[in-house]
Design a protein with these regions (language model features):
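Histidine-centered active-site microenvironments of extracellular/periplasmic hydrolases
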Residues: 6-14, 124-129, 138, 155, ...
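A long, amphipathic alpha-helix that forms part
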Residues: 91, 95-107, 131-173, 190
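Detector for Asparagine
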Residues: 69, 76-77, 119, 152, ...
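N-terminal start-of-chain detector that recognizes signal peptides
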Residues: 86-87, 148-150, 181-188
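Formylglycine-dependent
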Residues: 2-111, 118-127, 136, 147
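Short beta-strand segments
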Residues: 113-117, 176-179
Length: 198
């Protein structure tokens, strides 16, 4: 949503009848202890005071690649259904897709507006294990996680489009796909070269 976390900015106060998601800027894709994903989090200093990359158990990786600490995305920013916090254990991109497909199922008999705001491929970098395996050939871990997140989102958008097709709504639906970021700096996996800016 990212339009503000205070009650006056909640989607219900801006014309929406249903809401599933989070209201602040970002969110972890799975809750701690981050089971089923490879997680890379930014840290100013690694355990032991070193720089570079530190690999822990269960796919948790700390990196000084940005020179700052990853914000606590989930603090005071729960996943909510309607106005009530819910515990979501499914990878967030998949959970948002599940809810979108369910929404289409429940509203396929009348016009609707579905605003689906994925947080992928925004940080934190958390790639689902199944997608990480698909990109095992990518040596650079940052890029591998990014590719896993992007492929997951691509499949998820495909699932929403397939539901529209299955429901007979494909030819009577306007679809807008927007991204709030260009390619991030090299530290976050990509480059826009030979173009300038990000």
């Amino acid at each position: 949503w990212h339009q503000g976390g205070q009650a006056k900015y909640h989607p219900f106060r801006h014309g929406f009848d249903e809401f599933f998601g989070f209201t602040h800027e970002g969110h972890y894709f799975v809750p701690p202890p981050y089971k089923g994903v490879t997680t890379m989090l930014r840290r100013k200093t690694l355990p032991g005071g070193s720089k570079g990359r530190w690999v822990g158990d269960r796919g948790l990786i700390y990196s000084t690649h940005m020179g700052s600490n990853e914000p606590d995305y989930d603090a005071n920013n729960p996943i909510v259904r309607g106005g009530q916090p819910v515990v979501e254990h499914e990878y967030l991109t998949d959970a948002l897709t599940r809810e979108a497909v369910d929404f289409i199922d429940r509203h396929d008999d009348k016009p609707f507006l579905l605003y689906l705001a994925y947080n992928a491929v925004h940080s934190p970098l958390q790639g689902a294990d199944a997608y990480m395996k698909k990109f095992a050939h990518i040596d650079d871990l940052h890029r591998r996680i990014f590719a896993a997140m992007l492929a997951n989102m691509d499949d998820s958008v495909g699932a929403v489009l397939a539901k529209l097709r299955e429901s007979g709504l494909e030819d009577n639906t306007l679809i807008f796909f927007l991204s709030d970021n260009g390619g991030p700096t090299r530290e976050l996996t990509s480059s826009n070269l030979p173009l300038r800016g990000s």
